[in-house]
A protein has these predicted regions:
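Gly/serine-rich nucleotide phosphate-binding loop at the start of the catalytic core
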Residues: 1-76
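Stable alpha-helical structural segments in soluble proteins, enriched in small hydrophobic residues
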Residues: 33, 79-90, 352-362, 366
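Generic detection of short hydrophobic beta-strand segments and adjacent strand-loop junctions
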Residues: 7-9, 135-138, 199-201
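Non-catalytic, well-ordered alpha-helical scaffold segments
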Residues: 17-20, 24-27, 74-81, 252, ...
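Acidic carboxylate diad motif detector
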Residues: 52-156
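Well-ordered beta-strand positions in beta-sheet-rich domains
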Residues: 4-8, 150, 180
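Positively charged, helix-rich recognition surfaces that bind polyanionic ligands
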Residues: 142-144, 157-367
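Long, hydrophobic, amphipathic alpha-helical segments used as structural scaffolds
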Residues: 34, 38-41, 87, 91-98, ...
């Protein structure tokens, strides 16, 4: 299986210049090949493959722009392949048409492939060898076993540099368990399980969100492009990064616990893109990070021989009595948090009852 290990790197001034050049050249090649693809289609109504785009880069672009030859060839090829992935998504998944990349993008990255030992991690010296950069200082906080496949160098908006090493490695699956669980994704709580356990949303994030509001207010009073403007902007980026890291770490802990304790995990397949169009709920939905939680559950279930099922969005999990199956239309009102089934008299907590129904439906689908 493929697994990524992310490390912070500390490039020197010469290495930072080379990384910046690579970011710029990858962006340039991405934009040029996207424009070439569009032009050929408009003129000749002919589709252009990623191989055609790669040949165009090697034969035309590198001839006209000599400085492209100073950049790692795999990084340029992967930029073209990334453009092709975005292009294929436009046709197959009805995503938006690929956009041209801007040099002002907050997140910059490029990917290079392993060949003939050009990527190596030395845990003794705390350095990572990368094409065109040689040895880069790194914080190697955890070791790995396996064969390196690629490395992705990135720079986030706070200015920090990272490298993600993709490794082909063996993974020992978790021991089989007979316990199954249903999950009701919420806003007040991150999620509630069919066992009645509520995973709360982190309260500490509110502290950093207050800091963020204060910093954004300060930024609005700074002269644009002044030194203090950029200092405050960096503080804002660091605050965003802190919030993102706290949230992601918490989601990893929650998803690990759910996967470790259960063989079958069932949740709703929520259409988050459509839900955030409701401006009253958009921030709350983004804050609880349903997408990231379900993404983690999905890949961790595959790693560990678990079954993760998503049931239909429109399944009436909140309206059904989990004891007798009676459908109560009164529970369409979101303010109804507890109710008694008119048919069997069972008392229900709205969220726990929904989680039980979600589990029942998921198990029915795989029976």
């Amino acid at each position: 299986m493929l697994k990524a290990y992310k490390y912070r790197i500390y490039p020197n001034s010469e290495q930072r210049i080379q990384i910046a050049k690579t970011f710029g050249c990858c962006r340039f090649v991405y934009n040029q090949t996207l424009a070439y693809r569009r032009e050929i289609y408009e003129k000749e109504k002919k589709s252009v493959s990623k191989t055609d785009c790669n040949n165009y880069c090697n034969r035309e672009l590198k001839k006209d722009y000599e400085w492209l030859k100073e950049i790692d060839k795999f990084a340029l090829t992967n930029a073209i392949y990334n453009m092709d992935v975005a292009y294929q998504k436009f046709f197959k998944e009805h995503a938006g048409y690929p956009k041209f990349k801007s040099k002002h993008d907050n997140h910059k990255s490029y990917t290079t492939n392993f060949t003939n030992g050009n990527i190596a991690v030395d845990f003794e010296t705390g350095k990572i060898k990368l094409p065109k950069l040689k040895a880069v200082k790194a914080r190697l906080h955890r070791e790995y076993r396996g064969q390196i496949k690629s490395a992705t160098v990135s720079q986030v908006s706070s200015g920090k540099y990272y490298v993600s090493i993709l490794v082909e490695t063996e993974h020992k699956e978790l021991a089989h368990t007979n316990h199954n669980i249903g999950i009701d994704l919420g806003i007040k709580d991150l999620c509630i399980t069919s066992d009645g356990k509520a995973y709360e949303n982190l309260k500490i994030i509110k502290k950093y969100e207050k800091q963020l509001v204060k910093l954004q207010r300060q930024l609005s009073h700074k002269g644009k492009r002044s030194k203090n403007y950029y200092k405050t902007k960096k503080k804002i980026a660091l605050c965003h990064e802190k919030i993102r890291n706290i949230r992601k770490d918490y989601l990893h802990k929650v998803s690990h616990e759910i996967i470790s304790e259960n063989q079958v995990i069932v949740s709703e397949n929520l259409q988050i893109k459509n839900m955030v169009k409701n401006h009253h709920l958009a921030k709350a939905i983004s804050d609880v990070s349903w997408y990231e939680l379900t993404r983690q559950l999905e890949y961790k279930a595959k790693w560990n021989g678990r079954k993760y099922i998503k049931i239909d969005t429109f399944y009436a999990s909140s309206q059904l009595c989990s004891v007798c199956g009676y459908q109560n239309p009164d529970t369409k009102d979101l303010s109804v948090r507890t109710w008694i089934c008119p048919k069997c008299g069972a008392e229900h907590d709205r969220d726990i009852n929904a989680a039980k129904n979600i589990l029942t439906e998921g198990l029915r689908q795989i029976a």
